[in-house]
Curated annotation (Swiss-Prot):
NCBIfam families: trpB. Belongs to the TrpB family. CDD domains: Trp-synth_B. Pathway: Amino-acid biosynthesis; L-tryptophan biosynthesis; L-tryptophan from chorismate: step 5/5. It catalyses: (1S,2R)-1-C-(indol-3-yl)glycerol 3-phosphate + L-serine = D-glyceraldehyde 3-phosphate + L-tryptophan + H2O. The modification N6-(pyridoxal phosphate)lysine is found at residue 106. It comes from Methylobacterium radiotolerans (strain ATCC 27329 / DSM 1819 / JCM 2831 / NBRC 15690 / NCIMB 10815 / 0-1). Tetramer of two alpha and two beta chains. GO terms for molecular function: tryptophan synthase activity. Its cofactor is pyridoxal 5'-phosphate. Gene3D superfamilies: 3.40.50.1100. This is Tryptophan synthase beta chain.
Amino acid sequence: MTIAPEPNSFRTGPDERGRFGIFGGRFVAETLMPLILELEAAYETAKKDPAFQAEMESYGTHYIGRPSPLYYAERLTEHLRAKAPAGQGAKVYFKREELNHTGSHKVNNVLGQILLARRMGKPRIIAETGAGQHGVATATLCARFGLKCVVYMGAVDVARQAPNVFRMKMLGAEVVPVESGTKTLKDAMNEALRDWVTNVADTFYCIGTVAGPHPYPAMVRDFQSVIGRETREQMIAQEGRIPDSLVACIGGGSNAMGLFHPFLDDREVEIFGVEAAGHGVQSGLHAASLTGGKPGVLHGNRTYLLMDGDGQIADAHSISAGLDYPGIGPEHAWLHEMGRVTYLSATDSETLEAFKLCSMLEGIIPALEPAHALSKVLELAPQRPAEHLMVMNMSGRGDKDIPQVAEIFGTKI
């Protein structure tokens, strides 16, 4: 990795071509270009429209339940300080995105995109989903606004996320199991893109993460940045200053980008993204694109990808369906190369330990995705002084993972 010269601001990207340095861009079929340009124009107009922002805020407050709390994890903090040298052990806070309607951060972005689809007159919404959280959020808002909803989901994920599949169907969505490839998130995204090309006139593709062709990475980031903006205000209100460090899990990376982006130019704030190391990066069974991948093109953008020796997209593995993706958002790839964000990885076993500990100490059952981030908080917090303020994004709740985790622990539900 080469550290490029530091820019005046880390928050000005992407450029007019949708690039973050050499990452991002628009690598799509010609048939999609008019749609992409139409979407970009609609988003740029909506972004500047006070009525659109007011609508976002109103539904955010009254339907999603924002702002989400910034919660001092007191027992976890005490537990970690007991293991640390005297005077060590950061004060750990959770940004409680799991308390949002539908149970994760995903709804922040979906609300923005569905309001945009309505402005554009698109009555049919398609989405891809891995853990099912983005699918549930999309189905929920389609139900709220009376829009047709089709969700593509890898057949493997359909099996391991049965509660969310049922939720989507209850909300009126059509769930399409994808049997091609590895039958996970990558393949679901491929099928959604095929659908979009086929149904250009009436369909809006609601992408769930900071990936895909421009303007999606920037648009999803902007809709998720409410997380970081609230965190800044809440921490100043509670502690009189901004946090010293931020930690979030990364699949495509939307929850992380939402927390990180408002702090990127606060150079004193340490920022950590946590990828899924699966059975260990050396095992080859992982989803850590930055740790174990290299630059390439997938799903319309250039970013870090897991590839085999022939340059083909490799299979990703994670205990968490939401992190089981062989790429990462292009802005994360750029921040990695710029050295502004430190990217770590957590194994399945480390994640399960954090999952158990959080449940027992804080009475909060985390989703397996943020449990990855929490496993690194357990390592990082004891290395920081007691006055250090560390915020972890609790990006989803663990209800959806209970059947899977119970089975791992030998309990049949």
